[in-house]
Regions:
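Short C-terminal tail/terminal secondary-structure segment
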Residues: 2-5, 102, 154, 233, ...
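Conserved glycine-rich cofactor-binding loop
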Residues: 19-20, 43
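Substrate-binding pocket helix/loop in short-chain dehydrogenase/reductase
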Residues: 102-105, 109-117, 213
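Active-site helix of classical SDR
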Residues: 128, 165, 173
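Alpha-helical segment proximal to the catalytic Tyr-Lys
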Residues: 133, 178-182, 241
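Residue(s) in the substrate-gating loop at a strand-loop-helix junction
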Residues: 149
Length: 257
C-alpha cells in the first residue's frame, strides 16, 4: 500500500514562476499528487500553455499573469487565487530572475541591483506575506517554500546582487520559520545548483562554461525541473509537519567540492 502522507488530495498549491523550468516541474508533481494548482507567470502564452499541460492530471488549474516584484499585483493576484480555488495550503515562491555575469560591484549600477532584488527578494516577501496572512486567518496551517540558490552559500564573481538576493531569502526563511511555527506553518527553502532552464540556456550552451562546470558535478549532468517535483510534494505534504527552517540543496553534489 502506498504511503498516504504524500497524498495532496484536497490541498491547493500556488507556484509563482510556475510556467516553466523548476516551477513547472514542481507544479506538475503537486498536481499529480492530487493538489489543485495555481501558477503565476509573466508571459500569458507560456503560462496558459503550462496550465493546459497541468490539466492532464485531472485537478483544478488556474493561471495568472503576475509581476511578483509589484506589491499590489501580488495582493490582488493572491485574492483571486483564493476566490477561484477556495484557499491555499502550500505556497512556493519560485519566481526569479538571473543576475550572473551582469557586472562586478565596480560596474553595477543601482538599477541593475534592483532589477534582481525586487523580484528575487522583494517578490518572496510580498508572496509570503500574502500567503501567511491567509493561512493564519484560515487557521489550518500550511507550507511556505522559497526558491533560493547555491549562490546563497558560495561566492560567484559578477553576481553579487543575485547572491545577496538568494542569501536574503535563506535568512528570511529561517526567521519566518520561527515566527510562524505557532500557526502550524512550515517555512523552508530549496537551493538549486546548475539546472537546465530558459535562464541558463545561453551559459550551458557555451562549451567553455560547460567544460569548467560539468566536471564539478558528481552526477555529471545538469539538473532539470522534474528533479524538484518530489521535494515539492514532500514539503507540501503532512509528512513535513515537524520540518521547518531548513535549506534543501538539489545540485547533483556540486557544492560538495
Amino acid at each position: 500500500m502506498a504511503y498516504k502522507g504524500f497524498d495532496l488530495t484536497g490541498k491547493v498549491a500556488l507556484v509563482t514562476g510556475g510556467n516553466g523550468g523548476i516551477g513547472l516541474g514542481m507544479a506538475d508533481a503537486l498536481a499529480e499528487a492530487g493538489a489543485d494548482v495555481c501558477i503565476w507567470g509573466t508571459r500569458k502564452e507560456k503560462t496558459d500553455a503550462a496550465a493546459e499541460k497541468l490539466k492532464r492530471h485531472g485537478r483544478k488549474v488556474h493561471a495568472q499573469i503576475v509581476d511578483v516584484g509589484d506589491e499590489k499585483q501580488v495582493i490582488d493576484a493572491f485574492a483571486e487565487t483564493v476566490k477561484v480555488l477556495g484557499h491555499v495550503d502550500n505556497c512556493v515562491a519560485n519566481a526569479g530572475v538571473s543576475g550572473r555575469g551582469k557586472g562586478s560591484i565596480l560596474e553595477m549600477d543601482y538599477e541593475e541591483w534592483r532589477r534582481v532584488t525586487r523580484v528575487n527578494l522583494d517578490g518572496v516577501f510580498f508572496t509570503f506575506r500574502a500567503a501567511a496572512k491567509h493561512m493564519v486567518e484560515r487557521g489550518k496551517g500550511g507550507s511556505l517554500v522559497a526558491m533560493a540558490s547555491t549562490a546563497a552559500i558560495e561566492g560567484a564573481a559578477r553576481s553579487s546582487h543575485y547572491g545577496a538576493s538568494k542569501g536574503g531569502v535563506c535568512a528570511m526563511v529561517r526567521a519566518l520559520a520561527v515566527e510562524l511555527a505557532r500557526y502550524k506553518i512550515s517555512v523552508n527553502s530549496i537551493l538549486p545548483g546548475w539546472i537546465e532552464t530558459e535562464m541558463t540556456a545561453n551559459a550551458f550552451g557555451n562549451p567553455k562554461f560547460a567544460g569548467n562546470v560539468m566536471p564539478r558535478i558528481p552526477e555529471r549532468r545538469w539538473g532539470v525541473g522534474a528533479d524538484f517535483g518530489p521535494l515539492a510534494v514532500y514539503l507540501a505534504s503532512d509528512a513535513t509537519k515537524y520540518t521547518t527552517g531548513r535549506d534543501f540543496v538539489i545540485d547533483g553534489g556540486y557544492t560538495l567540492f
